[in-house]
């Protein structure tokens, strides 16, 4: 399914974009794909799908949710209700966080700041993929279909058994950790006195008129497209309903596009704030993937396009294969999903975005 495009000769046409989304399902791991592309000047607006997904279908955006957390945290900061450089202990108290960062026999959980959490520089281990003393992790159990709720208290209990990656705020260090965002979710609730799902709705979804976007809270809700893990659908509704702040939002490509453009156009905060977020630390080396303050950067090396530099993609990936990125060099915006939890589908999404960027000049 596609929506009609109205664009100038500068942008690729419908046939090219139809072929692009069709290429996304060539990978044997990708059973369905959705791609939405828009230009900042509004002259390109296209949406299509291939495989077992529809262009207007709801899907789990997974960690793209973290950009919503970024908006809320910065809003609270700008209102003077939150200090990024305050220790998380100020908002969460001592009891909850005690033992969450013990390195060399010293508990430094009281040294972890809100800025450390949102920039993934806290050193606190990711509860989802961090391996415990028995060599197992929570992620493996979930990917095998063991659907269980993971409230914050359980997350912190798990983290207490895991070794931190580095000292809080250690220069040049970054570790992607869902634990950080679960803690941020609770901080939002403490400051606002409301459930984080309600805060998302009040500060982000309703102001943007997003009617298909919501925090997934009802395990009986089957309206989002089921996620795939390799060749099979994976149903973990209890888990998703329990992890709102780290990745529990449902949306559509069109509504994620509305959010993505608002994130970068000054709707939520002054454009200068985007520069504040660009304090990059390399997550994957020697790869080209960096984490800033609440956003990610996928740098596209010159080898991908030696004669036509592509620049960078700013936004976020979701473990589910969801994506939301802005290419500032061409002022293009991309949202959608490959709906594959294994990680093997992300390359298909990158290839699609690169293909569109190369065709835009």
Q: Where are the regions that the model predicts?
A:
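Extended low-complexity intrinsically disordered regions
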Residues: 1-19, 26, 116-149
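Catalytic loop of the DD-peptidase/beta-lactamase superfamily, centered on the K-T-G motif
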Residues: 1-49, 56-60, 90, 171-173, ...
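Short, charged, amphipathic alpha-helices and their helix-cap/turn boundaries
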Residues: 35, 41-48, 89-90, 132-168, ...
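Active-site helix/loop module of the DD-peptidase/beta-lactamase fold
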Residues: 55, 60-64, 78-130, 161-162, ...
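Active/ligand-binding-proximal structured segments within catalytic/core domains
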Residues: 65-69
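Solvent-exposed loop/turn segments at secondary-structure junctions
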Residues: 124, 181, 340-342
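Aromatic- and glycine-enriched pocket-lining scaffold segments that form the walls
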Residues: 168, 173-181
């Amino acid at each position: 399914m596609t929506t009609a495009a109205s664009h100038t000769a500068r942008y690729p046409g419908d046939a090219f974009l139809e072929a692009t989304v069709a290429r996304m399902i060539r990978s044997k791991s990708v059973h369905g794909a959705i791609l939405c592309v828009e230009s900042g000047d509004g002259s390109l607006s296209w949406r299509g799908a291939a495989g077992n997904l529809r262009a207007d279908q709801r899907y789990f955006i997974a960690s793209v949710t973290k950009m919503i957390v970024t908006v809320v945290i910065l809003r609270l900061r700008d209102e003077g209700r939150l200090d990024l450089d305050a220790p998380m202990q100020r908002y969460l108290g001592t009891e909850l966080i005690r033992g969450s960062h013990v390195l060399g026999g010293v508990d430094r959980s009281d040294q972890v700041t809100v800025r450390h959490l949102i920039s993934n520089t806290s050193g606190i281990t990711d509860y989802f993929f961090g391996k415990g003393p028995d060599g197992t992790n929570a992620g493996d159990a979930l990917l095998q279909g063991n659907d269980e709720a993971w409230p914050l208290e359980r997350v912190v209990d798990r983290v207490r058994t895991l070794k931190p990656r580095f000292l809080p705020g250690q220069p040049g260090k970054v570790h992607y950790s869902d634990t950080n965002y679960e803690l941020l979710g609770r901080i939002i609730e403490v400051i606002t006195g409301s459930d984080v799902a309600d805060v998302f709705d009040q500060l982000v979804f309703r102001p943007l008129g997003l009617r298909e976007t919501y925090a997934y809270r009802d395990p009986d809700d089957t309206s989002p497209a089921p996620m795939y893990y390799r060749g099979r659908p994976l149903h973990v509704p209890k888990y998703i309903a329990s992890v709102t702040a780290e990745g529990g939002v449902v949306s559509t490509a069109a509504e994620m596009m509305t959010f993505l453009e608002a994130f970068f156009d000054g709707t939520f905060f002054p454009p200068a704030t985007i520069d504040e977020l660009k304090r990059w630390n390399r997550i994957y080396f020697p790869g080209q993937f960096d984490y800033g303050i609440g956003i990610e950067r996928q740098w596209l090396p010159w080898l991908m396009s030696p004669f036509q530099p592509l620049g960078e993609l700013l936004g976020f990936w979701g473990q589910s294969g969801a994506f939301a990125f802005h290419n500032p060099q061409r002022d293009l915006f991309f949202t959608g999903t490959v709906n594959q939890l294994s990680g093997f589908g992300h390359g298909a999404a990158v290839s699609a975005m690169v293909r569109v960027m190369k065709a835009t000049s």
